[in-house]
From Swiss-Prot:
Name of the protein: Altered inheritance of mitochondria protein 32
PANTHER family (alphabetical): ACTIN PATCHES DISTAL PROTEIN 1, ALTERED INHERITANCE OF MITOCHONDRIA PROTEIN 32
Species for this entry: Eremothecium gossypii (strain ATCC 10895 / CBS 109.51 / FGSC 9923 / NRRL Y-1056) (Yeast)
GO aspect biological process, one term: protein-containing complex assembly
GO cellular component: mitochondrial intermembrane space; mitochondrial matrix
Similarity comment: family membership: Belongs to the AIM32 family.
Organism domain of life: Eukaryota
One family name in Pfam for this protein: Suc_Fer-like
C-alpha cells in the first residue's frame, strides 16, 4: 500500500491534476453550518448509539492505492437497500455471486492486485445497454468502458481485466492492450505468435460521462445507508452535474467518515483510447454542503475540509 504501489502502477497521488483542480480552504457560511449541525443531530437521532456520526474525526490524507476500479452494475436503482449484503462476496444470488468469482480469479491474475471491486446502483442512467438474460454488466474505470459478461465467463473476464492468468507474462492480448489503442495492439502482435491472440476477448462500450459515486452500503453500515439517498437528491439538484452520472456504490472505506463520495472527472474526453481521468475522494459530506462542494468543482476547486485525497490516471 502507499507510494510504492502507486509508483508500480505508474500513478501518482497528484497535486497537479489533469483537469487543473486546486485545493482551497472555503469557510462555510453560517446558514450552511447551522444546516449541517441540524442534519447531524437528525441523523444521530435515527442511528444506534454505537453507529453515530462524529464530525471531529480527521480525514485520511490519501485514498486507497489502486490502479483500476471495476463496478458491477446492479439491475435496479434501489438494489442497494435489500440486495447488498454486508459483504457482497457472500451473496449467493446472481449477479452478485459474480463478485466472489471475479475477485477470486484476480488473486491469480498477472496484474490482479490494486483493483477495487464494488457494486453500483445508477440513479436513472440512460447510457447503459439493455441487460441480457444471464449476463452481468461491469463498468471499468478509468477507461470508462461497460462490458456485458455472460455468467459462465466471469473468471475469464477477470483474467482479461487482470492481464492474463498466472504471474508469467500473458500469452494473449488483455484489457490494457485494448485500452491503449490499436497502435499498441499492432506493436504487441509484432512481438511474435506467443505474445498475442487475434481479436479482443471482450468488447466494451464507451461510458462518456463523468461519474459521481456515493457510498450507500446500508447493510454494512447504517450511516452511509441513511445519508446516501439524501446526498443523491442534493446532487441531482445541481445544474453543473446535469451531464454527470450519479450512482450509489458499495463499501469504499471509512464509514465513520460518512458521507463518502468519489468524483471521476474525465479531464480530456478527446483521449478516446485512454482517457485522462482524475479521481477525487471526499468524506464527511452532508447534503447541506453539496452546493458549496459542487460550486467549487465547477471552478476546478477542491474543498479541503472534505478532501480525502486524489489520483490521476
Amino acid at each position: 500500500m502507499g507510494v510504492a504501489k502507486y509508483t508500480k502502477w505508474g500513478l501518482q497521488l497528484r497535486r497537479a491534476f489533469h483537469g487543473g483542480f486546486k485545493l482551497v480552504d472555503i469557510e462555510a457560511r453560517e446558514p450552511v453550518k447551522c444546516a449541517c449541525e441540524s442534519e447531524v443531530a437528525s441523523y444521530n437521532g435515527a442511528l444506534p448509539p454505537d453507529c453515530r456520526l462524529d464530525t471531529s474525526i480527521p480525514l485520511p490524507s490519501k485514498p486507497p492505492a489502486y490502479s483500476k476500479h471495476v463496478l458491477l452494475v446492479s439491475p435496479r436503482a434501489d438494489a442497494w437497500v435489500a440486495d447488498w449484503q454486508s459483504k457482497l462476496e457472500l451473496n449467493p444470488h446472481w449477479p452478485y455471486n459474480a463478485v466472489s468469482t471475479f475477485k477470486r480469479a484476480l488473486r491469480t491474475a498477472y496484474r490482479g492486485d490494486g483493483i477495487l471491486v464494488n457494486a453500483v446502483c445508477f440513479q436513472g442512467s440512460t447510457l447503459l445497454p439493455k441487460l441480457r438474460h444471464g449476463h452481468a454488466q461491469f463498468l471499468v474505470l478509468p477507461e470508462f468502458q461497460v462490458y456485458d459478461v455472460y455468467q459462465d465467463s466471469i473468471e475469464e473476464f477477470a483474467y482479461f481485466i487482470g492481464g492474463g492468468k498466472g504471474k508469467e507474462a500473458p500469452s494473449r492480448l488483455g484489457f490494457l492492450d485494448y485500452a491503449e489503442g490499436s497502435g499498441n495492439q499492432a506493436a504487441r502482435r509484432e512481438q511474435g505468435p506467443g505474445c498475442a491472440a487475434a481479436g479482443p476477448i471482450f468488447q466494451g462500450q464507451p461510458f462518456n460521462r463523468n461519474l459521481l459515486l456515493v457510498c450507500g452500503h446500508l447493510q454494512r453500515d447504517a450511516r452511509c445507508g441513511l445519508i446516501a439517498p439524501e446526498l443523491v437528491d442534493a446532487l441531482k439538484g445541481e445544474p453543473y452535474l446535469a451531464e454527470t452520472e450519479i450512482g450509489i456504490v458499495s463499501h469504499i472505506g471509512g464509514h465513520k467518515l460518512a458521507g463518502n463520495l468519489i468524483y471521476y472527472s474525465r479531464a480530456d474526453p478527446s483521449h478516446v483510447d485512454k482517457p485522462l481521468v482524475d479521481a477525487l475522494w471526499f468524506g464527511k459530506v452532508l447534503p447541506a454542503m453539496i452546493p458549496t462542494l459542487v460550486d467549487a468543482l465547477s471552478q476546478k476547486k477542491i474543498v479541503s475540509a472534505n478532501y480525502r485525497g486524489g489520483i490521476s490516471f
